């Protein structure tokens, strides 16, 4: 059964509908590739998928461990090739984790392993460099 239904709307824009929920995503070609850049580009969604997958799988592992994963933040940077063919060459994910006594060194290592082995990370072509970095805030320091 299909997961997504996508229509090309013209002018380098698509609309994708998640069939189970009805949620819609618009994509637009980026300004550096003759588009308007008014929405996520398809390659932006690839980079976004990596970050979202990392957060989701960390949440799943924490839930299995009986831990409520606190709200965290991440920035995602997508780097495109300078030469042809146009492609993603690097995705940088910088994750800031809030202070929590739950995050022992052992648990931090578990979360970092989870991030590096989420389904999207394992599905991306090995030529795409994945730079996944954590900034673990410490309880009582800078909080």
Question: Locations of the language-model features?
Answer:
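Extended beta-strand/beta-hairpin segments
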Residues: 1-48, 59-143
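Alpha-helical metal-binding/catalytic segments enriched in His/Glu/Asp
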Residues: 53-54
């Amino acid at each position: 059964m299909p997961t997504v239904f996508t229509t090309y709307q013209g002018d380098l824009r698509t609309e994708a509908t998640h069939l189970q929920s009805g949620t819609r995503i618009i994509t637009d070609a980026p300004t550096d590739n003759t588009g308007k850049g008014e929405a996520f580009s398809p390659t932006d969604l690839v980079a976004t998928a990596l970050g979202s997958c990392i957060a989701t799988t960390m949440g799943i592992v924490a839930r299995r461990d009986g831990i409520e994963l606190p709200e965290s933040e991440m920035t995602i940077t997508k780097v495109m090739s300078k030469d042809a063919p146009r492609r993603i060459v690097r995705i940088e994910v910088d994750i800031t984790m809030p202070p929590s006594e739950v995050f022992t060194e052992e648990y931090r290592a578990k979360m970092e392993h989870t991030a590096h082995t989420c389904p999207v990370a394992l599905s991306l072509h090995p030529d795409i460099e994945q730079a996944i970095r954590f900034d673990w805030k410490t309880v009582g320091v800078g909080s």
